[in-house]
Amino acid sequence: MALPLSTCLLFHPKESRSRRFCFSPASASLKSGLHSATSAKIASMPTCFEQTRGRIAKLFHKDELSVSTYDTAWVAMVPSPTSLEEPCFPDCLNWLLENQCHDGSWARPHHHPLLKKDVLSSTLACILALKKWGVGEEQIKRGLHFLELNFASATDKCQITPMGFDIIFPAMLDYARGFSLNLRLDPTTFNDLMHKRDVELKRSNRNYSSETETYWAYIAEGMGELQNWESVMKYQRRNGSLFNCPSTTAAAFIALRNSDCLNYLHLALKKFGNAVSAVYPLDIYSQLCTVDNLERLGISQYFSTEIQNVLDETYRCWMQGNEEIFMDASTCALAFRTLRLNGYDVTSDPVTQILQECFSSSFRGNMTDINTTLELYRASELVLYPDERDLEKQNLRLKLLLEQELSSGLIQSCQLGRSINVEVNQAIEYPFYAIMDRVAKRKSIEHYNFDNTRILKTSYCSPNFSNEDFLFLSIEDFNRCQAAHREELGELERWVVENRLDELKFARSKSAYCYFSAAATFFAPELLDARLSWAKNGVLTTVIDDFFDVGGSVEELKNLIQLVELWDVDISTECYSHNVQIIFSALRRTICEIGDKAFKLQGRCITNHIIAIWLDLLNSMMRETEWARDNFVPTIDEYMSNAHVSFALGPIVLPALYLVGPKLSEEMVNHSEYHNLFKLMSTCGRLLNDIHGYERELKDGKLNALSLYIINHGGEVSKEAAIWEMKSWIETQRRELLRLVLEGKKSVLPKPCRELFWHMCSVVHLFYSKGDGFTSQDLIQLVNTIIHQPILLNDQTGAGLSKLHD
């Protein structure tokens, strides 16, 4: 079951301190987008790329929102404040007269065939407005003819039912009867509509709650004499509107002549001219949607200045308690998630309060918006502080709710064409901390729905919600980067051969996996050197780990450490064995190569630091070897102080920090923040490894964190209890790591460097999500999708993009 009315609505009655709920602007999308794309044609269009980029940039400077014939019709019904016999907004009437479709309806251009109920509702509202003021007889006649021909759609269960349709549309039919409009309607359909309205009203009365009151207030124009207008006006906002909805506000003014309602309608018309939109204002949500699209699709780097401006403005509005954010569940959740992920200091209290209201409500009727539920779930994942227990609890409840939706098999989205079941399944199976950045972006591209239609009481759209330009740019960028990544992988594989690492028969060959972990996390072309440093050191740590585990004698291991300590040695005479010679030669050559590249960026020699990083790893591995040889059983603390280093992430991550752009001073790399980030990241990895490798290592007679935890507790703790404790430890370490990565004000390390620690944390979470490290077939498929398989357009989407960009 999705969240109820409260997830879609946040209202603020004047005499109540508790928040209520308002309709979320994210409702329905109508076209299924891309599943796959050819890079050949796209790669040959640099001019088209820039043109597309330019069109997207314009979205930051102008919010484009469609007008609503339904809401405009209700505004047109508003009488003058000085005379009930004259329209207050005659220009709205003229707009209705000029915008009737050829078939007699007042439909949006190119409306979806499943939106016939919306078209019926909009058309009837327009007829009522014209009839009220005695204009447009010909338009009324054509509109009535359209209604009569299409009336059966009003009860068609295959059609999308706009919010409140079953109440509002029958009410408007009653209004039409009062205007003596001669509607020749099928009596069976008409009676079915009226019966359904009566049933819903009776059900709502039986289960009356604050949520019911909220819902009735939102559909005020359809309640007629049943409406308690005093109750409705509790939901009036500071801008004079009811729910930022022109139609509801117009109905309220018609009933009460409230001057603030009228002022709001003037503002809405000032924004759009002679018509209004279905929701106003929607600027913050629209801009956040643009940012979210760009970030999810992996093209935010092309709009960094524009995005920064949106984030700063959103943060300003957040701090001011702007109603546009806090009166809407989706906007609040999206703003919180976007701001927190971009390092802004925002409290989770508003999101928690929304969720507490949701779950405390007994109302499970008219409003079930799975899209808003998913948005709230994503926001609730971002627990950073120990005092955010309430947010953590709500996250677990939301996860359970989404799992129930999936298992029911009845999960539906208000956004037609959106693969909401896929999104929900992915969100549950791969939390944000357990999916690598490029993997998430490819999935977003593959399931992208570029229709931008949403549905509340009527449909509306905006290119800020989604559009083909976002899709086109993301496909081209992904495939272009992927082509470069394939070349880099080829370079890595040549490096393996040139350094004779392929001759080491004891070692696992994992060059593709090592490179994948880099390409799937920091993929920008300019980070080539950082990726290759990461991947080469990943290969070397795998080789050396195997050397310590199975490939080398104690004499060889000691010799390797001694060679690294001495460094400038004659390998032809100082190496204990052929294997040691290959490993040390590759290690020394690679460290020097990385040191030379880093020198160009840093302006100082960092080779000795890389050597020290490697020595830390080698000595920690040697310590574990000696413990095993001597049958020494360390305490869990002794084990972890060494094991977080022996997990071997140091040589992979730390040298790469010098190659991602910012300069790192010696003071920075000696700072406690640097070491804390490394320890948190490595502890997560080590504990995940030890949980998943417990049975195998137990059979091999090896100790790890899980077995030591059980031993240190006298064997009185079960394996399951120990695993639960380990996972809690991982969660604590991961959240602290994320907090340090996101909090920028007090940070010493530059953000691009801090992010590498989080990227590696995501890598290890994904690698251990299904099996023990490099064993999952799913992982093999992921490597192929990120490095080898370009995104291909299906026929329908490809034709749409070709038409758009030819």
Curated annotation (Swiss-Prot):
Q: Which residues bind Mg(2+) 1?
A: 545, 549
> Per its UniProt record, what InterPro entries does this chain match?
Isoprenoid_synthase_dom_sf, Terpene_cyclase_plant_C1, Terpene_synth_N, Terpene_synth_N_sf, Terpene_synthase-like, Terpene_synthase_metal-bd, Terpenoid_cyclase/PrenylTrfase
| The protein's annotated pathway | Plant hormone biosynthesis; gibberellin biosynthesis
Q: What is its main location?
A: plastid
Please state the Enzyme Commission number of this protein.
Answer: 4.2.3.19
Q: Which family does it belong to?
A: Belongs to the terpene synthase family.
User: Which comment does the entry carry about domains?
Assistant: The Asp-Asp-Xaa-Xaa-Asp/Glu (DDXXD/E) motif is important for the catalytic activity, presumably through binding to Mg(2+).
Q: What's the name of the protein?
A: Ent-kaur-16-ene synthase, chloroplastic
Q: Which organism does this record belong to? A: Salvia miltiorrhiza
Tell me the classification of the organism that encodes this protein: Eukaryota, Viridiplantae, Streptophyta, Embryophyta, Tracheophyta
